[in-house]
């Protein structure tokens, strides 16, 4: 009899929990999603898997291929919607160190030594120095392989490290003091910039694709902005057929243009191309792509996406991770 009463109470508890869950707002249980990506010209979308990093920030792992199915591309896209509680931070090895303060880092900025470190370790150093929650990290600008100096703009916490290395004339991605983002030509006044990192050239400028004609298939990396202020980062793995053959620059341009990006710059690709994320419900930043060297490479600068959300201790939503979350067209 006691066993029967216990079983009845257990079932009553389970039913009560289920009924409570049905009363929770649907959006509290739903993962962020973005629209299915538009493939680059001449490519088809094979699959797309979306992961929420925080509300308004979505990681999309995609596979593209030719219609013949003989040139697969593995891509990693992060979409940061306007109003998302996150911001970008430029990073360079040795700037963010444990125990440093904004004041000490400002003093250090004028004499920062050129050196290299992995993207994920730069993110870890940022967290040690500031306590910030890095939810996405990617490598940044080209650099001089002898001196390790980045070629273009580098601004961190409003501290101008350099506008260029005396030779390059690179455009730059910027976080402005009002919290908005911009991609600007070299030479444009940067007094209103908090964070900046350069890329060697434009992929899209003022809504116009910048095709190069370069036929090389390579790992590619980039960042762009849509007309509504949405920021898109995209990395394509390469040199690893049949897993991922890579992209030409023009294919990368075509892909970004199809997503509605109006301004975009190229970032360092090849073996340096790195994309790491911390998915909602997890505690560690993990490299999601497969660097073509087989391991994560040390790089000069990096770009970190940091959550600015503050916990108030109140339940907001549950993070659900079903086993099958893949979008496959026409399935």
Regions flagged by a language model, labelled:
Residues 135-139, 172-174, 181-182, 222-224, ...:
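Structural recognition of the beta-strand scaffold that forms the well-ordered cores
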Residues 63-67, 72-77, 198-228:
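Conserved beta-alpha junction segments in alpha/beta enzyme cores
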Residues 166-210:
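A substrate-binding/cap region within the structured catalytic cores of diverse enzymes
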Residues 2-14:
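Bacterial N-terminal signal peptides that target proteins for export
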Residues 31-165, 182, 325:
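Zymogen propeptides
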Residues 13-23:
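Bacterial N-terminal signal peptides
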Residues 21-35:
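Sec-dependent signal peptide cleavage junction
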Residues 147-167, 209-262, 272-324:
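Conserved, well-ordered active-site substructure
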């Amino acid at each position: 009899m006691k066993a029967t009463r216990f079983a009845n109470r257990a079932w009553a508890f389970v039913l009560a929990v289920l009924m409570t869950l049905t009363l929770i707002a649907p959006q509290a249980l739903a993962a962020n999603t973005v629209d299915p990506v538009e493939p680059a010209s001449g490519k088809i979308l094979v699959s797309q898997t979306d992961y929420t990093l925080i509300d308004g920030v979505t990681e999309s792992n995609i596979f593209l291929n030719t219609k013949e199915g003989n040139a697969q591309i593995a891509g990693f896209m992060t979409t940061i919607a306007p109003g998302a509680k996150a911001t970008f931070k430029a990073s360079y090895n040795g700037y963010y160190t444990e125990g440093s303060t904004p004041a000490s880092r400002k003093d250090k900025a004028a004499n920062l030594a050129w050196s290299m470190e992995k993207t994920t370790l730069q993110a870890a150093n940022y967290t040690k120095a500031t306590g910030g929650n890095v939810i996405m990290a990617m490598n940044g600008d080209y650099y001089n392989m002898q001196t390790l100096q980045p070629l273009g703009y580098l601004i961190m916490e409003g501290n101008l490290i350099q506008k260029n290395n005396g030779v390059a004339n690179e455009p730059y991605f910027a976080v402005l003091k009002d919290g908005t983002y911009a991609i600007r030509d070299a030479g444009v006044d940067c007094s209103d910039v908090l964070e900046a990192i350069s890329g060697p050239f434009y992929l899209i400028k003022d809504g116009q694709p910048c095709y190069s004609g370069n036929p090389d298939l390579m790992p590619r990396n980039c960042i762009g902005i849509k007309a509504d202020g949405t920021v898109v980062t995209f990395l394509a793995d390469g040199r690893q057929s049949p897993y991922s053959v890579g992209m030409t620059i023009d294919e990368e341009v075509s892909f970004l243009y199809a997503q509605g990006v109006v301004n975009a710059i190229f970032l360092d690709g090849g073996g340096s191309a790195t994309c790491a994320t911390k998915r909602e419900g997890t505690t560690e930043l993990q490299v999601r792509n497969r660097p073509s060297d087989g391991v994560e490479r040390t790089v000069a600068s990096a770009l970190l996406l940091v959550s600015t959300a503050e916990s108030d201790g109140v339940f907001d939503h549950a993070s659900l991770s079903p086993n099958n979350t893949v979008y496959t067209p026409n399935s």
